[in-house]
């Protein structure tokens, strides 16, 4: 049977976990084997900008950080389960990638 690897990423971990819980509930309801959600390391993207735009005065900086949270779910890809997963409402802040493998 084919397997599906579902990769989820988001800057909002609460919404990401909500989508993972919905997929987990679908897998339990349809009775397919599932592994995950496996949390991958959080990537922290950092940007430092200078507060003063004219270059005069003391050097003071703003530090901005964006954290990207990732999860991986491996699931058996039967037709009924995949139809239910495709109908899950996914927030705009969550990116999803589904890869089918044999």
UniProtKB/Swiss-Prot annotation:
<protein>
    <recommendedName>
        <fullName>Small ribosomal subunit protein uS10</fullName>
    </recommendedName>
</protein>
<dbReference type="GO" id="GO:0006412">
    <property type="term" value="P:translation"/>
</dbReference>
<dbReference type="GO" id="GO:0003735">
    <property type="term" value="F:structural constituent of ribosome"/>
</dbReference>
<dbReference type="GO" id="GO:0000049">
    <property type="term" value="F:tRNA binding"/>
</dbReference>
<dbReference type="InterPro" id="IPR036838">
    <property type="entry name" value="Ribosomal_uS10_dom_sf"/>
</dbReference>
<dbReference type="InterPro" id="IPR027486">
    <property type="entry name" value="Ribosomal_uS10_dom"/>
</dbReference>
<dbReference type="InterPro" id="IPR018268">
    <property type="entry name" value="Ribosomal_uS10_CS"/>
</dbReference>
<dbReference type="InterPro" id="IPR005729">
    <property type="entry name" value="Ribosomal_uS10_euk/arc"/>
</dbReference>
<dbReference type="GO" id="GO:0015935">
    <property type="term" value="C:small ribosomal subunit"/>
</dbReference>
<keyword id="KW-0687">Ribonucleoprotein</keyword>
<comment type="function">
    <text>Involved in the binding of tRNA to the ribosomes.</text>
</comment>
<comment type="similarity">
    <text>Belongs to the universal ribosomal protein uS10 family.</text>
</comment>
<dbReference type="InterPro" id="IPR001848">
    <property type="entry name" value="Ribosomal_uS10"/>
</dbReference>
<dbReference type="Pfam" id="PF00338">
    <property type="entry name" value="Ribosomal_S10"/>
</dbReference>
<comment type="subunit">
    <text>Part of the 30S ribosomal subunit.</text>
</comment>
<keyword id="KW-0689">Ribosomal protein</keyword>
């Amino acid at each position: 049977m084919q397997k599906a690897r579902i990769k989820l990423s988001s800057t909002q971990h609460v919404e990401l976990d909500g989508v993972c819980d919905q997929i987990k509930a679908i897998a339990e309801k349809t009775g397919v084997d599932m592994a995950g959600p496996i949390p991958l390391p959080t990537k922290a993207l950092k940007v430092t900008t200078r507060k003063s735009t004219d270059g005069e005065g003391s050097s003071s900086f703003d530090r901005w950080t964006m954290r990207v949270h990732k999860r991986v779910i491996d699931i058996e890809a039967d037709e009924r389960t995949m139809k239910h997963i495709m109908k899950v409402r996914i927030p705009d802040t969550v990116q999803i990638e589904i890869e089918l493998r044999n």
